Every structure is written in C-alpha cells, then in structure tokens.
A protein has these predicted regions:
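Short beta-strand->alpha-helix junction loop in the catalytic core
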Residues: 211-220
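A short helix/loop element that forms part of the nucleotide-sugar donor recognition site in Leloir-type
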Residues: 220-234
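Nucleotide-sugar donor phosphate/pyrophosphate-binding loop at the beta->alpha transition
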Residues: 149-151, 160-180, 190
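An amphipathic, basic-hydrophobic alpha-helix
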Residues: 100-129, 134-141, 145, 172-176
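Conserved donor-binding/catalytic core segment of Leloir-type glycosyltransferases
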Residues: 234-251, 257-262
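A short beta-strand/loop micro-motif in the catalytic core of glycosyltransferases
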Residues: 182-192, 208-210
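Carbohydrate-associated surface elements
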Residues: 76, 194, 213
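N-terminal subdomain of nucleotide-sugar transferases
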Residues: 2, 7, 11-95
Length: 265
C-alpha cells in the first residue's frame, strides 16, 4: 500500500461471505472508487526522521488526498504528541518505551484494550500494520478477533541486522517471529521482487510487491542545477550518485561503492 505522485495503489477488500477468508489485493487507479476507513498502526511517524516515517507520511497523505479516512495509531513520542502531516487525521496515542539502539524513538507497548475500544466504536475497513513490535502484535491480535482485514509492511530485515549488533545468535528466532507475525495477516507489502523471493523461500506467504513511489514533480530534470554540478566538479554528462542515510553496517554501503565503480566503466 504505497503512493506515487501519479498513481495510487489502494488496498481493496473482498469478502465473499462472513464465513469465508478475506482476500486483499492491490489495484491502481486515480481518485477512490469508494472511501475506506483505514487504521494505520506504526511505531514511527513524522516528526521522526527515518525512512519508515517518511514513507508512511507520503502514503497517508496520498490516501487522504484520494478521499480515504485515516486513523493513525502510534506511541506517544518524547518531544511531541501530535504527528506532522499535510492534512488532518485522527490519532490514538499509546504508551511506549525507548527502542534499543534507537533511543530517539519509542517502541509502542501492547494496547489491546485501547484498540478494541477504538475499532469496536469506529470499525475500520482495513488495519495496516507498519511495524512488528509489541504494539503491532497487539493490533494484529485485536484485528483478528474482530475479523477486520489486516495488511502489514515488511520494511526492515531485523534478522539480518542482528549480526551487526552482536546478537547474531538470535537471527533464527527473530526470523521465526517475523514469519509468524506476517503470515497472520491477509497480505504483506514488500518493496522489491528480490525481497519477496527471499521471504517466500523463508516461508512467508501472501506477499505483495509495492515499489517505492517517486514524486516526479520534485525529482525532475527541470530542476537540474549547473551551479550545483559545477560545485561538484561534475561535467555535463557525468553520472553523479548520491547516498542519503545513516552510515551503518546494515545499510550495505559496499554495494553502493560497487555500483558506482560499475557505472564508471
């Protein structure tokens, strides 16, 4: 479930009967054929600065622009209570605690009672869970109990990252938990076919490839700056590569350097 500037991929729900399984699939179209009530559960959202927060912000803004109603569920952060978004939406703020290795962020604690109360009062058409922490797990359990369709995001290879932080011995247990978590959903969104193939080989089911969108008005050849290129000492036709992100082992920056070397050939 992700938005580009031109296209909007909206989660559609097909329930053939009360007693049959729910099927979630993606379809591209412009303005919504009908308005959906979507509850988004996440550990992070702007003003947090990270890839998941930025991606979710774009997704929520795009869904709102197409007429959908969003209810955001997230832990209360230290510096702010209200999320930042281009348009208003409802929020449920829950208790949280600092995340190990990312103390600037807070991990949502289980919130079964709050979620059951909210979703019983205002039942969503679909619950979308972006993170797999205690808050996400409790959201998954409540949604299943209330028979609400659930989609999830697989954005972070926590099992692969574990070796970079001295807990590689937990890799198998982490992967097992992630597989159990996502396989309990009706659909799991992944950004690339490569990741989908890898997860499928590890026993993950109902994977949907949803590539990252690009704002073609913001990132456009019309904004090309010769002054900026001159400051880089880059010629007119020379390829310039830019990496934006943390300098961390799990970012696989060796691949960036290898790609750069191949591009120069």
């Amino acid at each position: 479930m992700f938005l580009t500037h031109e296209f909007h991929q909206i989660v559609l729900i097909k329930r053939h009967s009360r007693w049959m399984n729910t099927h979630i699939h993606l379809e591209r179209f412009g303005h919504a054929r009908w308005a959906l009530n979507i509850s988004v559960v996440t550990e992070t959202f702007p003003p947090d600065i990270n890839g998941v927060a930025h991606t979710l912000s774009k997704m929520v803004s795009g869904l709102q622009a197409n007429g959908h109603d969003i209810w955001l569920v997230r832990p209360r952060q230290q510096k702010t209570q209200l999320a930042q978004s281009g348009q208003g939406f409802n929020e449920l703020l829950v208790k949280g605690m600092p995340i190990p290795f990312y103390k600037q962020l807070r991990m949502g604690l289980p919130a079964k009672k709050e979620l059951h109360r909210l979703w019983s009062f205002k039942r969503p058409d679909v619950v979308h869970i972006a993170t797999e922490g205690p808050l996400g797990w409790s959201a998954l359990q409540v949604a299943r109990k209330l028979r609400i369709p659930v989609s999830t995001d697989f954005r972070t290879n926590f099992h692969a990252y574990s070796s970079h932080y001295g807990i590689g011995w937990l890799s198998g247990a982490i992967l097992s938990y992630m597989r159990k978590f996502h396989n309990a959903a009706d659909a799991t969104m992944v950004p690339t076919q490569q990741l989908a193939d890898s997860l499928h080989n590890s026993g993950f089911e109902r994977l949907q490839v949803v590539p990252r969108g690009i704002d073609t008005l913001l990132f456009s050849p019309a904004k090309r700056s010769h002054f900026l290129r001159d400051s880089w000492k880059a010629t007119e036709n020379q390829i310039v590569m830019l990496y934006v992100g943390r300098l961390a082992a799990e970012k696989n920056l060796k691949l960036v350097l290898q790609t750069y070397a191949m591009a120069k050939q």
